């Protein structure tokens, strides 16, 4: 998928701090990464957006993908587009099928996690809805640092974009 931008390192390191419960250190690393990342202007299903990111603070300007049997973080600034097929069966509530368009105009078939990590273990009143990717709930792990549960939700300056309702995100390069 190419050489990652320098800001990916601090974003990955922040996950290690999340795992140990050191959310303040994770937040500082994420802030540094977000300051360095390029805003990703795009169109989402034909609507122009000045910026676009995953609503989950752990990810922000990256798209989690499975391509060729391997897990990748694809920086949105390194991508020309993401197209997703409409959900057709139960698998699509966990893995959204589609393809990414790379800067060299190569098209790569991908699976994108339709749910956030930990959703399968959800309990409580909305557990079934979360597991079925019908809703998204947010947990503020640290001031200003939000972790999602349930359906993946992309955010932009024009609103929210649930992954299962989104068909095409195009990024100009």
Mark where each language-model region is.
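Helix-rich interaction surfaces within compact, conserved domain-sized segments
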Residues: 113-173
